């Protein structure tokens, strides 16, 4: 009986374990099917974004390549991505899931939510097409533990997908000391976070995934991935993305209402309703309405305002953001136990930083001053803030100098309120040699005068030619002499014989030991004697014939060489900087031809400076490249280069093609500049 009971128990356990295994397998199969369906629904709408970024550093505009991910959210080709991916772009290229690469235009950049809206641009004359798109889902329906898929292009590789779960659908970042909201700050200083409760998840996020969709198992976009690392990922909810998208569709921009107070939760006040006023911004609608720190706001425009916990603060700001700009709203509040109602006129919320631009001829960059900047940085509300000064240019050489952080208030005779005023003032003063500028530095208002001219290009040095042998040598030091088998050897060992020279024609060879000049022994044996032979040659007459005593393979012999004029150095060559594309070139010299082993009749201009962040550097142009042609126009000299480039600047072709000689091989360099930014 015991054996029978034991056998039955074992059979029951076996059946139970088998049922559990089958149940797990069924769940895994169902999950796999859901993942595949979600993937198939959204993957066709995934885009890989390549951007040419424009940023400002060192007093000039610079350019770099970047990238990220995005998702098509409408059949007419609207794309959602991150602001920090696309905001600085002057060129945007989107690669679709079928491999087609299209240029895109930015419709709106929204720093407050870290979202940008782009539109795909079909090729010219191409028929209209309906793009595959992914639907926006309901981020408010997400719960902790829900499965989500992070899609994107990590490390700019092809499309990928990772699986995770929602860890917290309402994540905010708090200051641990006072429980106030912390903003995310981007490289250029823009801030995001006051309006956002992020979706925290653990699907793997890598660089390049930014801007890609967070997808539920229905195949709906419930978020736009923003950042991640160490097993943590954060996405902007689709609720916010939908609001941004709809505003851009409707009006072409995103505008938000603003009252000008900092909201805090009421939990510490032992109350569940209202929102605590932590600070009131000077000259804001809230201050004008008489609102004070410590007030508890109960209703705005008749709608309850409740933020008991920090996670509810973004909802308060979102409610205010939806108020019509210019509308006068009633605000019910409580102060010291008494209830009162005040009136405030809603103003437009401003971005933290204003627009920035380069003023190339004067060598500086500047940005508009916004009210938020003025409040936090003690700047005037009107004027432009200098963000960089280029060494050697007019602002840098003025006394006193204008430096980064100064605010320009007046340029010439014109008052400066913004960048447009500054552009007009510079244009009006372009024929004026000396221009007075009034600027503010901290609490001082200073005046300076600049000379209205860029730095002069270096003049070619007027070198007089000297007698030249046409070889390079090293001193026969004692260790070298011993290695050569005769410790008593003194003089010079030939290390290079320049081509096309009299020395080459006379038969001098690398490895020859020069022991005497015109019968006079050479006594060089120390490294400091390295120029002795060169100096003795330079004191002789050009065209004179000298007799060298050399040792070759143990045999002494005499070789006669006619001295020739020393070739012009690089400093003596004509040079020019191409200001629009920001690189410098010079004529090539005979010495260049010799050292690079170019043909004796080789022509072209030699690239001498390609600054970091320039269009040339972005395209792969290098110092030492020899430019042979520009847009199929042959280049022989600096004069040819200047004439061809003047025509290029006038025509502004989408691609400037440089045909170059690099490391003894020819190659092409394709520059694709943003002419609008360059020539404004």
Model-predicted segments: where are they?
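Surface-exposed beta-strand/loop segments enriched in Pro/Gly
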Residues: 377-389, 589, 594-610
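Positively charged n-region of N-terminal signal peptides that target proteins for export
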Residues: 1-4
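C-terminal soluble interaction/assembly domains
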Residues: 416, 422-423, 608-656, 663
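Bacterial N-terminal signal peptides
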Residues: 6-16
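C-terminal interaction modules of eukaryotic adaptor/scaffold proteins
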Residues: 665, 669
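Conserved catalytic motifs of ABC-family nucleotide-binding domains
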Residues: 294, 405, 511, 624
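Serine-dependent protease modules
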Residues: 21-293, 299-328, 334-339, 345-372, ...
